Amino acid sequence: MGACFSVAISCDQAVNNLTSCLSRNQNRFRNLVDHVAALKKTVRQLEARRDDLLKRIKVQEDRGLNLLDEVQQWLSEVESRVCEAHDILSQSDEEIDNLCCGQYCSKRCKYSYDYSKSVINKLQDVENLLSKGVFDEVAQKGPIPKVEERLFHQEIVGQEAIVESTWNSMMEVGVGLLGIYGMGGVGKTTLLSQINNKFRTVSNDFDIAIWVVVSKNPTVKRIQEDIGKRLDLYNEGWEQKTENEIASTIKRSLENKKYMLLLDDMWTKVDLANIGIPVPKRNGSKIAFTSRSNEVCGKMGVDKEIEVTCLMWDDAWDLFTRNMKETLESHPKIPEVAKSIARKCNGLPLALNVIGETMARKKSIEEWHDAVGVFSGIEADILSILKFSYDDLKCEKTKSCFLFSALFPEDYEIGKDDLIEYWVGQGIILGSKGINYKGYTIIGTLTRAYLLKESETKEKVKMHDVVREMALWISSGCGDQKQKNVLVVEANAQLRDIPKIEDQKAVRRMSLIYNQIEEACESLHCPKLETLLLRDNRLRKISREFLSHVPILMVLDLSLNPNLIELPSFSPLYSLRFLNLSCTGITSLPDGLYALRNLLYLNLEHTYMLKRIYEIHDLPNLEVLKLYASGIDITDKLVRQIQAMKHLYLLTITLRNSSGLEIFLGDTRFSSYTEGLTLDEQSYYQSLKVPLATISSSRFLEIQDSHIPKIEIEGSSSNESEIVGPRVRRDISFINLRKVRLDNCTGLKDLTWLVFAPHLATLYVVCLPDIEHIISRSEESRLQKTCELAGVIPFRELEFLTLRNLGQLKSIYRDPLLFGKLKEINIKSCPKLTKLPLDSRSAWKQNVVINAEEEWLQGLQWEDVATKERFFPS
């Protein structure tokens, strides 16, 4: 009986437990399948909203804006909640299988109860987070720097005293407006640049220094625009405001600031009140400007003026001979002749620089005697003196390239590659795989002769305004009235219409860059016109007649006209070799384009509205094709047409189509001419295998909005796929790769293959939620030995490093790196990155700027005290 009684109690308990379980949890168990499905759906919605937000963030950050803290907080919560949700969902199949009794109960009642509860709670969390993820704004502008450093290329000789006296004059209590005047090329801009930079090194109580280049033909609105951008006032509605409205905005901003306004290269009086500049004396603010004319100083009503004069003889001789030591010692009579030539420069720094550099290469006394005869006397015109350096250029092609470079506006920096492509289009140099070598050789010749000046990044060049005047003077026949219409250069002249030309039949080159021209309707009757530059205007309409009578036009640049949607027939342009339609709003290519049998260069980059191009193979002589960031669907058919182009030597391309990408990666012939490759919205691969040969010539590589867990690099001489790591051979090297950008890519854990990009200058890694290391920690020890064998120094030429929104990133590289050219590090929202690969020897002699959140910088670990003092002094 006892045994039966015991069993009865046990059964009762089991029944009671089952009844209790069913009564308490039947709805929870019965609805588990629905709750799991709802959680999956809501997580997908949250991930989609996150991805859309990341795209908006990318656009804003590309504009220099900083991510809002509330948006960053939301993204961090999303990453956390999504990971937690996926962990819960990974158990869903097992838990659903455990349901029994018509899904009213579970084989593991207590555990399933807890699981069902966690699903419901997480669903509520995700729904709540989804509702919070609606943001009108995602980013805002950061603090305005007090001063922006100015770089100057001219050798500083003999200006020490005038810099000090100018600074002291500006600091005088009674001086609010200072005028600096002197002839062209005397060093006024260099002087003003040094004054600007003193605000970085000398203690002062100014709130902001503002630099504006005025130049010829200034407009109030253009000056207002530059000031507005510096004050962070410029926005999308700026163009619709009147000058008076903008002036009021600028005035309100400056009234409560102690400002320093530096206006360079003023040719006429500028009404400061119309611009919105408050009276400087009221709160100790200062305004200084440079001009070639003392008359401008008088018209401006300056409180004090300073004349910048030519150098005294000792300083002039020092500047002239600074690179001549070996030359002066090569013959005993050369110093005497050199002094004769130096004196003819009249102490003008620009002439001394230009002529001195030219003469430094002449080693024989005969060459020096010949140079003396070029100058007619001490009173020779400065353009004639400067022309000597032009005449000394041995190659006629180099001379032609130099003269072409004057078609751009004053102070206009143009990319070296862009300039070379113009030269090819004009037929000055031939296009080929070696184009850059020849073009860069010519640029090197011109920069060494001080006829072109390199930008800070070395990627762009510009002309000194006096040198540009000389080039335009030469192109127009050195003052010969009969040739004055050969060249029409009205760049940055505030034109609203195509200018009237007195003798159209004489015109060979026309540059109307950077104006406000909206329509080009009247026919150009220019039978000799070879070059027409209309880039960076406001073009909306080009009539059929406009281009009907320019039979030998070779270069046509319509780029940077975003409102230009339709184009007339290009059938009359049968001589055209160069066509740039980048950054326009065109929706289709013009009629007659495919009949242009002489076309060598076609640029369709950033034509977002252009969706298709047809029969590209009908352009048999095309050598350069640029399709980066266009809206064109690069289908497998189009890729095969590009494959068949026999003369192509430069290609940029954005691939969104998986079939097109497979054909592209499968043909190593693309390697010889693909300069830039962008993979966009690629989510078809668990492992993307990229043949080394396909990207060995690429200068930039971008991967964005993609899910690719692994990037593998296939070797160039075997069928084995080699992940760039310890087994990489010496021949695996991305020798040409200069820029890498990865944006919103999931799955990638590291970027170890970047070690073998020895010339990488820019690395931009943003929104990679899974990346843990830039260079894999597990491979570093073996990589180090491989690098030594291959002669590779990781990141030795890296200049700019940007890492943002990398929640799992723990390290860049295990050991400190030399970073021989590093200029800037930008870190944001990388909470697990606690140390940079720097020591006290890193970036030696470089002034590295580290931009990061203050809290993150304070918590950063440093190699030692010396390293911290070097990069983050207290």
From Swiss-Prot:
Keywords: ATP-binding, Coiled coil, Leucine-rich repeat, Nucleotide-binding, Plant defense, Repeat
Residue windows of the LRR repeats: 483-505, 506-527, 528-548, 552-574, 575-597, 598-620, 621-642
Annotated GO biological process: defense response
Coiled coil regions, renumbered to chain: 22-74
Pfam families referenced in this protein's UniProt entry, alphabetically: LRR_8, NB-ARC, WH_DRP
Family per record: Belongs to the disease resistance NB-LRR family.
Domain notes: The LRR repeats probably act as specificity determinant of pathogen recognition.
PANTHER family: NB-ARC DOMAIN-CONTAINING PROTEIN, NB-ARC DOMAIN-CONTAINING PROTEIN-RELATED
Protein name as it appears in the record: Putative disease resistance protein At5g05400
